[in-house]
Amino acid sequence: MIEICSELKLLEKYNNCNMKTFHLAEGPGGFIEALTYLRSNNEDQYYGMTLIDGNDYVPGWKKSKTFLENHNNVNIETGSTGNGDLLQKENLLYCYEKYKNTMDLITADGGFDFSIDFNKQELVASKLLFAQVVFALAMQKNGGEFVLKVFDIFTKSTVDILYLLSTLYDSVYIMKPNTSRIANSERYIICKKFVKPKQYDSLMNRIIDNYHQVNTMDYITSIFDFSLNHYFINKLEEYNAILGQQQIENIMYTINLLQSRQKNEKIESHKRNNINKCVMWCAKYRLPHYNDSNINTVSNRFIPDMIKVDENRQCDNSVNMVA
Protein backbone atom coordinates (compact mmCIF):
# COMPACT_ATOMS: atom_id res chain seq x y z
CA MET A 1 0.00 0.00 0.00
CA ILE A 2 2.90 2.34 0.75
CA GLU A 3 4.32 1.75 -2.72
CA ILE A 4 0.92 2.25 -4.39
CA CYS A 5 0.25 5.49 -2.52
CA SER A 6 3.69 6.84 -3.33
CA GLU A 7 3.81 5.98 -7.03
CA LEU A 8 0.28 7.12 -7.82
CA LYS A 9 0.18 10.00 -5.33
CA LEU A 10 -3.09 8.81 -3.83
CA LEU A 11 -2.81 10.85 -0.66
CA GLU A 12 -1.43 14.17 -1.90
CA LYS A 13 -4.76 15.97 -2.15
CA TYR A 14 -5.54 15.04 1.46
CA ASN A 15 -2.34 16.53 2.91
CA ASN A 16 -4.18 19.46 4.49
CA CYS A 17 -7.38 17.75 5.55
CA ASN A 18 -8.67 14.72 7.40
CA MET A 19 -9.61 11.49 5.62
CA LYS A 20 -12.22 8.78 5.94
CA THR A 21 -11.27 5.41 4.51
CA PHE A 22 -12.96 2.02 4.33
CA HIS A 23 -11.07 -1.25 3.94
CA LEU A 24 -12.94 -4.30 2.62
CA ALA A 25 -11.78 -7.86 3.38
CA GLU A 26 -9.04 -6.11 5.33
CA GLY A 27 -8.03 -8.62 8.02
CA PRO A 28 -5.44 -8.65 9.49
CA GLY A 29 -5.17 -4.93 8.70
CA GLY A 30 -2.06 -4.30 6.60
CA PHE A 31 -3.57 -1.54 4.45
CA ILE A 32 -4.91 0.36 7.46
CA GLU A 33 -1.56 0.08 9.24
CA ALA A 34 0.24 1.43 6.16
CA LEU A 35 -2.11 4.41 5.92
CA THR A 36 -1.86 5.29 9.60
CA TYR A 37 1.93 5.24 9.20
CA LEU A 38 1.87 7.45 6.10
CA ARG A 39 -0.74 9.88 7.41
CA SER A 40 0.16 10.18 11.12
CA ASN A 41 -3.15 11.95 11.64
CA ASN A 42 -5.21 10.96 14.66
CA GLU A 43 -8.20 12.84 13.23
CA ASP A 44 -8.48 10.46 10.26
CA GLN A 45 -11.15 7.77 10.52
CA TYR A 46 -10.43 4.24 9.30
CA TYR A 47 -13.04 1.49 8.95
CA GLY A 48 -12.15 -2.15 8.42
CA MET A 49 -14.55 -4.94 7.50
CA THR A 50 -13.61 -8.57 7.05
CA LEU A 51 -15.27 -11.95 7.44
CA ILE A 52 -15.42 -13.03 11.08
CA ASP A 53 -14.82 -16.76 11.03
CA GLY A 54 -13.37 -19.29 13.45
CA ASN A 55 -11.29 -21.04 10.79
CA ASP A 56 -7.57 -20.25 10.92
CA TYR A 57 -7.32 -19.94 7.13
CA VAL A 58 -9.69 -16.94 7.16
CA PRO A 59 -7.68 -13.75 7.87
CA GLY A 60 -9.06 -11.95 10.89
CA TRP A 61 -8.01 -9.29 13.37
CA LYS A 62 -6.11 -11.51 15.83
CA LYS A 63 -2.66 -10.45 14.58
CA SER A 64 -3.65 -6.78 14.85
CA LYS A 65 -4.67 -6.72 18.50
CA THR A 66 -1.85 -4.45 19.68
CA PHE A 67 -2.17 -2.16 16.67
CA LEU A 68 -5.92 -1.76 17.20
CA GLU A 69 -5.47 -1.03 20.89
CA ASN A 70 -3.04 1.78 20.03
CA HIS A 71 -5.22 3.40 17.35
CA ASN A 72 -8.60 4.62 18.57
CA ASN A 73 -9.43 6.02 15.14
CA VAL A 74 -9.52 2.52 13.61
CA ASN A 75 -13.04 1.11 13.68
CA ILE A 76 -13.94 -2.54 13.11
CA GLU A 77 -17.21 -2.84 11.19
CA THR A 78 -19.13 -6.11 11.22
CA GLY A 79 -22.27 -5.03 9.36
CA SER A 80 -25.88 -5.88 10.03
CA THR A 81 -25.19 -9.62 10.30
CA GLY A 82 -22.35 -9.17 12.78
CA ASN A 83 -19.91 -11.31 10.79
CA GLY A 84 -18.65 -8.85 8.16
CA ASP A 85 -19.74 -11.05 5.25
CA LEU A 86 -19.58 -9.01 2.02
CA LEU A 87 -21.80 -11.49 0.20
CA GLN A 88 -24.82 -10.77 2.39
CA LYS A 89 -27.46 -8.34 1.09
CA GLU A 90 -28.15 -7.07 4.61
CA ASN A 91 -24.56 -5.90 4.98
CA LEU A 92 -24.56 -4.11 1.63
CA LEU A 93 -27.76 -2.25 2.52
CA TYR A 94 -26.32 -1.45 5.97
CA CYS A 95 -23.13 0.06 4.54
CA TYR A 96 -25.01 1.95 1.84
CA GLU A 97 -27.36 3.58 4.33
CA LYS A 98 -24.64 4.30 6.90
CA TYR A 99 -21.67 5.33 4.73
CA LYS A 100 -23.15 6.45 1.41
CA ASN A 101 -20.91 8.99 -0.41
CA THR A 102 -18.57 9.45 2.58
CA MET A 103 -15.35 7.54 1.90
CA ASP A 104 -12.34 9.33 0.41
CA LEU A 105 -10.39 6.11 -0.11
CA ILE A 106 -11.61 2.52 -0.25
CA THR A 107 -9.40 -0.55 -0.50
CA ALA A 108 -10.34 -4.17 -1.22
CA ASP A 109 -7.71 -6.79 -0.45
CA GLY A 110 -9.81 -9.96 -0.42
CA GLY A 111 -8.53 -13.38 -1.37
CA PHE A 112 -8.86 -17.10 -0.74
CA ASP A 113 -6.65 -20.13 -0.22
CA PHE A 114 -6.18 -21.17 -3.84
CA SER A 115 -3.64 -23.93 -3.17
CA ILE A 116 -6.18 -26.66 -3.97
CA ASP A 117 -6.58 -25.47 -7.56
CA PHE A 118 -4.67 -22.39 -8.74
CA ASN A 119 -6.20 -22.74 -12.21
CA LYS A 120 -9.60 -21.71 -10.85
CA GLN A 121 -8.52 -18.86 -8.60
CA GLU A 122 -9.97 -16.18 -10.87
CA LEU A 123 -13.35 -17.92 -11.04
CA VAL A 124 -13.39 -18.70 -7.32
CA ALA A 125 -12.65 -15.06 -6.52
CA SER A 126 -15.30 -13.68 -8.91
CA LYS A 127 -18.10 -13.32 -6.34
CA LEU A 128 -15.87 -11.63 -3.78
CA LEU A 129 -14.39 -9.38 -6.45
CA PHE A 130 -17.84 -8.27 -7.57
CA ALA A 131 -18.97 -7.80 -3.96
CA GLN A 132 -16.02 -5.57 -3.13
CA VAL A 133 -16.69 -3.36 -6.15
CA VAL A 134 -20.38 -3.02 -5.25
CA PHE A 135 -19.56 -2.13 -1.63
CA ALA A 136 -17.05 0.44 -2.85
CA LEU A 137 -19.62 2.07 -5.12
CA ALA A 138 -22.08 2.14 -2.23
CA MET A 139 -19.70 4.16 -0.02
CA GLN A 140 -17.34 6.09 -2.33
CA LYS A 141 -17.31 9.87 -2.11
CA ASN A 142 -17.45 11.75 -5.39
CA GLY A 143 -13.82 12.32 -6.45
CA GLY A 144 -12.55 9.53 -4.19
CA GLU A 145 -10.12 6.69 -4.86
CA PHE A 146 -10.46 2.90 -4.89
CA VAL A 147 -7.74 0.21 -4.73
CA LEU A 148 -8.76 -3.33 -5.69
CA LYS A 149 -6.62 -6.47 -5.58
CA VAL A 150 -7.21 -8.91 -8.44
CA PHE A 151 -5.42 -11.94 -9.76
CA ASP A 152 -5.54 -13.03 -13.40
CA ILE A 153 -7.55 -10.90 -15.83
CA PHE A 154 -8.72 -13.53 -18.30
CA THR A 155 -12.37 -14.30 -17.56
CA LYS A 156 -15.21 -12.13 -18.85
CA SER A 157 -16.43 -11.28 -15.36
CA THR A 158 -13.08 -9.77 -14.34
CA VAL A 159 -12.77 -7.89 -17.62
CA ASP A 160 -16.33 -6.60 -17.20
CA ILE A 161 -15.50 -5.34 -13.71
CA LEU A 162 -12.49 -3.42 -15.00
CA TYR A 163 -14.60 -1.96 -17.79
CA LEU A 164 -17.22 -0.87 -15.25
CA LEU A 165 -14.56 0.82 -13.13
CA SER A 166 -13.15 2.61 -16.18
CA THR A 167 -16.57 4.21 -16.74
CA LEU A 168 -16.95 5.31 -13.11
CA TYR A 169 -13.49 6.74 -12.41
CA ASP A 170 -11.50 9.41 -14.20
CA SER A 171 -8.44 7.15 -14.53
CA VAL A 172 -7.74 3.47 -13.85
CA TYR A 173 -4.32 1.87 -13.43
CA ILE A 174 -3.04 -1.70 -13.27
CA MET A 175 -0.03 -2.05 -10.99
CA LYS A 176 2.21 -4.92 -9.97
CA PRO A 177 4.12 -3.56 -6.94
CA ASN A 178 7.72 -4.57 -6.33
CA THR A 179 6.59 -6.09 -3.05
CA SER A 180 4.24 -8.48 -4.88
CA ARG A 181 5.89 -11.80 -5.81
CA ILE A 182 6.62 -11.94 -9.53
CA ALA A 183 5.48 -15.56 -9.85
CA ASN A 184 2.14 -14.65 -8.27
CA SER A 185 -0.81 -13.47 -10.38
CA GLU A 186 -1.64 -10.78 -7.84
CA ARG A 187 -1.93 -7.22 -9.13
CA TYR A 188 -3.79 -4.09 -8.11
CA ILE A 189 -6.37 -1.94 -9.86
CA ILE A 190 -6.06 1.68 -8.76
CA CYS A 191 -9.03 3.91 -9.58
CA LYS A 192 -8.71 7.68 -9.17
CA LYS A 193 -11.44 10.34 -8.95
CA PHE A 194 -14.82 8.67 -8.70
CA VAL A 195 -17.38 10.23 -11.04
CA LYS A 196 -20.78 9.71 -9.46
CA PRO A 197 -23.34 8.63 -12.12
CA LYS A 198 -26.44 10.77 -12.61
CA GLN A 199 -28.67 7.77 -11.90
CA TYR A 200 -26.57 6.68 -8.90
CA ASP A 201 -29.40 6.15 -6.41
CA SER A 202 -31.59 4.15 -8.77
CA LEU A 203 -28.56 2.10 -9.86
CA MET A 204 -27.60 1.25 -6.28
CA ASN A 205 -31.21 0.43 -5.33
CA ARG A 206 -31.46 -1.94 -8.28
CA ILE A 207 -28.17 -3.63 -7.35
CA ILE A 208 -29.21 -4.01 -3.72
CA ASP A 209 -32.62 -5.43 -4.68
CA ASN A 210 -30.95 -8.16 -6.74
CA TYR A 211 -27.86 -8.71 -4.59
CA HIS A 212 -29.24 -11.87 -2.98
CA GLN A 213 -28.68 -13.65 -6.30
CA VAL A 214 -24.91 -13.56 -5.74
CA ASN A 215 -25.16 -16.39 -3.22
CA THR A 216 -27.25 -18.55 -5.55
CA MET A 217 -24.39 -19.09 -8.03
CA ASP A 218 -21.01 -20.78 -7.81
CA TYR A 219 -19.23 -18.16 -9.89
CA ILE A 220 -20.02 -14.90 -11.63
CA THR A 221 -19.28 -15.47 -15.30
CA SER A 222 -20.48 -12.20 -16.82
CA ILE A 223 -21.80 -8.75 -15.91
CA PHE A 224 -22.47 -7.11 -19.27
CA ASP A 225 -24.33 -8.65 -22.20
CA PHE A 226 -22.69 -6.45 -24.84
CA SER A 227 -19.30 -6.38 -26.55
CA LEU A 228 -16.69 -4.22 -24.89
CA ASN A 229 -14.60 -1.50 -26.48
CA HIS A 230 -11.89 -3.01 -28.76
CA TYR A 231 -9.22 -0.57 -27.60
CA PHE A 232 -9.96 -1.48 -23.98
CA ILE A 233 -9.67 -5.21 -24.73
CA ASN A 234 -6.44 -4.73 -26.70
CA LYS A 235 -4.80 -2.85 -23.82
CA LEU A 236 -5.76 -5.59 -21.36
CA GLU A 237 -4.30 -8.21 -23.70
CA GLU A 238 -1.05 -6.24 -23.83
CA TYR A 239 -0.88 -6.02 -20.04
CA ASN A 240 -1.65 -9.71 -19.65
CA ALA A 241 1.17 -10.52 -22.08
CA ILE A 242 3.67 -8.36 -20.18
CA LEU A 243 2.77 -9.66 -16.73
CA GLY A 244 2.42 -13.24 -18.00
CA GLN A 245 5.89 -13.15 -19.52
CA GLN A 246 7.33 -11.89 -16.24
CA GLN A 247 5.65 -14.77 -14.41
CA ILE A 248 6.94 -17.37 -16.86
CA GLU A 249 10.50 -16.05 -16.71
CA ASN A 250 10.48 -16.01 -12.91
CA ILE A 251 9.05 -19.52 -12.64
CA MET A 252 11.59 -20.86 -15.14
CA TYR A 253 14.39 -19.13 -13.26
CA THR A 254 13.25 -20.78 -10.02
CA ILE A 255 13.05 -24.23 -11.64
CA ASN A 256 16.52 -23.86 -13.19
CA LEU A 257 17.89 -22.64 -9.88
CA LEU A 258 16.59 -25.69 -8.02
CA GLN A 259 18.04 -28.01 -10.66
CA SER A 260 21.45 -26.33 -10.70
CA ARG A 261 24.52 -28.11 -9.34
CA GLN A 262 25.62 -24.86 -7.75
CA LYS A 263 22.18 -24.42 -6.21
CA ASN A 264 23.30 -23.44 -2.70
CA GLU A 265 25.79 -20.86 -3.93
CA LYS A 266 23.27 -19.31 -6.33
CA ILE A 267 20.57 -19.23 -3.68
CA GLU A 268 22.87 -17.38 -1.29
CA SER A 269 23.76 -14.89 -4.02
CA HIS A 270 20.07 -14.44 -4.82
CA LYS A 271 19.28 -13.84 -1.15
CA ARG A 272 21.98 -11.18 -0.89
CA ASN A 273 20.66 -9.41 -3.97
CA ASN A 274 17.12 -9.53 -2.60
CA ILE A 275 18.22 -8.13 0.75
CA ASN A 276 20.04 -5.35 -1.05
CA LYS A 277 16.96 -4.52 -3.13
CA CYS A 278 14.77 -4.57 -0.01
CA VAL A 279 17.06 -2.08 1.72
CA MET A 280 16.96 0.22 -1.31
CA TRP A 281 13.17 -0.17 -1.52
CA CYS A 282 12.87 0.96 2.10
CA ALA A 283 15.22 3.87 1.42
CA LYS A 284 13.23 4.91 -1.65
CA TYR A 285 9.98 5.06 0.31
CA ARG A 286 11.64 6.50 3.43
CA LEU A 287 10.88 3.54 5.64
CA PRO A 288 12.99 2.51 8.64
CA HIS A 289 15.14 -0.51 7.90
CA TYR A 290 18.04 -2.53 9.24
CA ASN A 291 21.14 -1.55 7.26
CA ASP A 292 23.75 -4.30 7.59
CA SER A 293 27.16 -3.05 6.48
CA ASN A 294 28.16 -6.63 5.73
CA ILE A 295 25.60 -6.90 2.92
CA ASN A 296 27.32 -6.85 -0.43
CA THR A 297 25.63 -4.07 -2.36
CA VAL A 298 25.11 -4.33 -6.09
CA SER A 299 25.31 -0.82 -7.54
CA ASN A 300 23.38 -1.55 -10.73
CA ARG A 301 20.45 -3.40 -9.13
CA PHE A 302 18.45 -0.41 -7.90
CA ILE A 303 14.72 -0.85 -7.92
CA PRO A 304 13.60 0.76 -11.19
CA ASP A 305 11.27 3.73 -11.18
CA MET A 306 7.68 2.93 -12.08
CA ILE A 307 6.76 3.47 -15.69
CA LYS A 308 3.30 4.63 -16.64
CA VAL A 309 2.26 3.22 -20.00
CA ASP A 310 -0.35 4.98 -22.16
CA GLU A 311 0.09 8.47 -20.78
CA ASN A 312 -2.69 9.89 -22.96
CA ARG A 313 -6.03 8.11 -22.78
CA GLN A 314 -7.37 7.49 -26.26
CA CYS A 315 -10.95 6.71 -25.35
CA ASP A 316 -13.36 6.97 -22.45
CA ASN A 317 -12.76 3.36 -21.41
CA SER A 318 -9.04 2.98 -20.89
CA VAL A 319 -6.64 1.65 -18.32
CA ASN A 320 -3.05 2.62 -17.65
CA MET A 321 -0.30 0.32 -16.49
CA VAL A 322 2.30 0.96 -13.83
CA ALA A 323 5.00 -1.63 -14.42
Where are the regions that the model predicts?
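Conserved Class I SAM-dependent methyltransferase catalytic core
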Residues: 119-174
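Short amphipathic alpha-helical segments embedded in low-complexity Lys/Glu-rich regions
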Residues: 17-24, 48-53, 149-157, 162-164, ...
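C-terminal lobe and adjacent flexible extensions of AdoMet/dcAdoMet transferase-like proteins
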Residues: 3-9, 33, 178-323
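Anionic group-transfer/hydrolysis microenvironments
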Residues: 111, 151, 194
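The AdoMet/dcAdoMet-binding core of the Class I SAM-like
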Residues: 2-137, 154
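Composition- and surface-driven signal marking solvent-exposed, interaction-prone regions
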Residues: 34-37, 161-162, 266
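Intrinsically disordered, low-complexity regions enriched in proline, serine, glycine
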Residues: 13-14, 33, 58-59, 118-119, ...
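Beta-strand cores of modular interaction/reader domains in eukaryotic scaffold and signaling proteins
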Residues: 20-23, 47-48, 107, 145-149, ...
